[in-house]
Curated annotation (Swiss-Prot):
Entry-linked PROSITE patterns: THF_DHG_CYH_1
SUPFAM superfamilies: Aminoacid dehydrogenase-like, N-terminal domain, NAD(P)-binding Rossmann-fold domains
Organism, scientific name: Stutzerimonas stutzeri (strain A1501) (Pseudomonas stutzeri)
Gene: folD
Binding of NADP(+), residues: 166-168, 232
Gene Ontology cellular component annotations, sorted alphabetically: cytosol
Gene Ontology molecular-function annotations: methenyltetrahydrofolate cyclohydrolase activity; methylenetetrahydrofolate dehydrogenase (NADP+) activity
Name recorded for this polypeptide: Bifunctional protein FolD
Length: 284
């Protein structure tokens, strides 16, 4: 068996095209373009690349993109004041704080300061709580993007044994909520899990988000399973590898996401979707 690739790059491009068309319709109706404010603190090279991609995406679809690039010694109270200012700005529909932040800053406090209706990353406790209560509003971008990738396969998720490897607030925990909502029997594994291989071997669907290159071995994959690899780990030779051993896994799985070109583009596309949703349904 050779797995079919789930092409996140192409699916994300289609989403951007649809959003661009909707923004053009808004402008023709005399409505403003959606606005996204991105806050970048410090000069982390990877963060700078990610933010540049997000700004390019905004430009492509016709959003109003507002950049706030701040020095690494920015104080917590100054960031909170900036968020308050953006909360009150009617031209801004979404506020994004790029992670990781310098160690002296409290990310949780910053996320909670963002108004829930402008929390386009989906990290605010209100939005996570709505997802847990089966009433999602602004959904965390990476899990939301993964659900779109899964929908593209046409596979019925109801009743599947799903295993999420990694329990972060950004991916693992909200991913488990999304899969429960989709009717999966969901297990979350983490750093204290015993015998990870045993859990993965029985999974019809496995989502891996740990940041550990090749953590999940190809031989663990159940024949015919769906494999979603969220990891993107740069090697010393410049290659980008995922958290799953791709080649042997693709010989056993029915569907698999590539790294790069799988989950990453979908996270960015869903950020745009959330911003458009906030503009049209929460702010217009």
């Amino acid at each position: 068996m050779t797995a079919k690739l789930i092409d996140g790059k192409t699916i994300a491009a289609n989403i951007r095209q649809q959003i661009s068309g909707r923004v053009a319709e808004r402008r023709a109706q005399g409505l403003r373009a959606p606005g996204l404010a991105v806050i970048l603190v410090g000069s982390d090279p990877a963060s700078q690349v990610y933010v540049a991609h997000k700004r390019k995406d905004c430009e492509e679809v016709g959003f109003n993109s507002v950049a706030h690039d701040l020095p690494s010694d920015t104080r917590q109270e100054d960031l909170l004041a900036l968020i308050d200012q953006l909360n009150d700005d009617a031209s801004i529909d979404g506020i994004l704080v790029q992670l990781p932040l310098p160690k002296h800053l409290d990310a949780s406090q910053l996320f909670e300061r963002i108004r829930p209706d402008k929390d386009v990353d989906g990290f605010h406790p209100y939005n996570v709580g709505r997802l847990a209560q089966r009433m999602p509003l602004l959904r965390p971008c990476t899990p939301k993007g993964i659900m779109t990738l899964l929908e593209s396969t046409g596979v019925d998720l109801h009743g599947l044994d799903a295993v999420v490897v990694g329990a972060s607030n950004i991916v693992g925990r909200p991913m488990a909520l999304e899969l429960l909502l989709a009717g999966c029997t969901t297990t979350v594994t983490h750093r204290f899990t015993r015998n990870l291989a045993e859990h993965v071997r029985r999974a019809d669907l496995v989502v891996v988000a740990t940041g550990i290159t090749g953590l999940v071995k190809g031989e663990w994959i159940k024949p015919g399973a769906i494999v979603i690899d969220v990891g993107i780990n740069r090697q010393t030779d410049g290659r980008l590898l995922g958290d799953v051993e791709f080649e042997p896994a693709s010989e056993r799985a029915a569907w698999i996401t590539p790294v790069p070109g799988g989950v990453g583009p979908m996270t960015r596309a869903c950020l745009l979707e959330n911003t458009l949703y906030a503009a049209e349904h929460l702010h217009d």
